[in-house]
Amino acid sequence: MSFTRNFAPYYLAGLIPSRKEETGGCDRGPNADRPAASLEMVYFCPIQNHTQTINNIDFMGKILVVGAGGVSTVAVKKMAMNADVFTDIMLASRTKSKCDRIAEDIKNVRVRTAEVDADNEDELVRLFEDFRPELVVNLALPYQDLHIMNACLKYGVSYLDTANYEPLDEAKYEYSWQWAYKDRFREAGLTAILGCGFDPGVTGVFTAYAAKHHFDELHTLDIVDCNAGDHHKAFATNFNPEINIREITQKGRYYEDGKWHETEPLSVHQALNYPNVGPRESYLMYHEELESLVKNYPTLRRARFWMTFGQEYLTHLRVMQNIGMTSIKPILYKGVEIVPIQFLKAVLPDPGELGENYTGETSIGCRIRGLKDGCEQTYYVYNNCSHRAAYEETGAQGVSYTTGVPAMIGAKMFLEGQWRRPGVWNVEEFDPDPFMKELNVQGLPWHEIFGGDLEL
């Protein structure tokens, strides 16, 4: 592993080799002329209090996770299951008691907890200074992405998230706000990994893997997301209700022939067959990974995203829309300003508590058409995840699991040096192979279908 970061002068007295090798920016200590006391080369990177042993890649894997919902529950528990890499974990949230409950379930590794307001950059920086992480994993709200990225730059620590930035007062999300940080992260020698959940995240890695191994040109991409589970609630969302409802009530959007096309929300739909599930009505939506994938794979002629919804879910959603409960505009109630969708979130079931009675499975994948050696080829790569198995392993339902596990894998890729590059990057811009290998190891095995009917 090598470093590309530039660190301010700081010296670690002790085991420093006498040779004058280039350290990639990590400073050699004042005892550089002393005989080496070890065959290993040890350098100290002061911004994170990070000791790096070059030869055997033995390092302090200090991770700070922001957010304490269902995804964080999975990510932190999976980090603890990989304690050889994640040697020191802190979980921080606005409500420390939520962090404490997650930490109490983990027996083999100490997980420290802290209270932090992710909207307060100075507060974040003080927490970073106290814990000195190597990587900050942002599993908080998308509204807080830029605050956390700013704090990472102020302190000097790398960054990973699972969802792109969305303004609090506008139901609109796109990568442009975060891509604008690319030069700042590069100049600071820091890595920012964007969208490392399942979709976005694994879907980008699936696409990169297909492009690397199975296609010379990608022509069409359809990302298909099916939740064939039953949580036995009249109405509930599988992740943060506010974010979920804002997402699915936006206009649909897809890419074709070099242009973006809009559709009315959930107006385009068709039945698609999902492995081990069967046919499910699937609705065309806009999803953030489309923006980066058409940019990084310019041979794509069309890219779309589809998600399944049951009729009961859609009926409840229409009623809530019709009575104004999904609005993001503040209203006055008894002299107090409230946002209807935030109130709705408060009364809906907590997604983190759905797992116990959840049955069924998810099925998410990429259906791709393109050319290989001059011949047209179709390819479908997907994962199915059991809600019951996810709950038995982590205490969370399958949607949280399919997001939290990739976040952990992305952090692991960073700590191991496989996904470490100054700048701001989407996951498909890294080598997909080690990530794909980890999916099979960490509980999200994937499957491939060559030459099948893509239905799209």
Where are these regions (language model features)?
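Conserved Rossmann-fold cofactor-binding substructure of NAD(P)-dependent oxidoreductases
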Residues: 118-131
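C-terminal catalytic/substrate-binding lobe primarily of soluble NAD(P)-dependent oxidoreductases
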Residues: 212-456
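Helix N-cap at the beta1-alpha1 junction of Rossmann-like dinucleotide-binding domains, i.e.
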Residues: 95-97
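Rossmann-fold cofactor-recognition segment
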Residues: 106-120
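N-terminal Rossmann-like NAD(P) cofactor-binding module of classical short-chain dehydrogenase/reductase
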Residues: 128, 134-138, 160
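Conserved N-terminal Rossmann-fold NAD(P)-binding element of oxidoreductases
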Residues: 63-70
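Rossmann-fold NAD(P)-binding glycine/threonine-rich loop
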Residues: 163-190
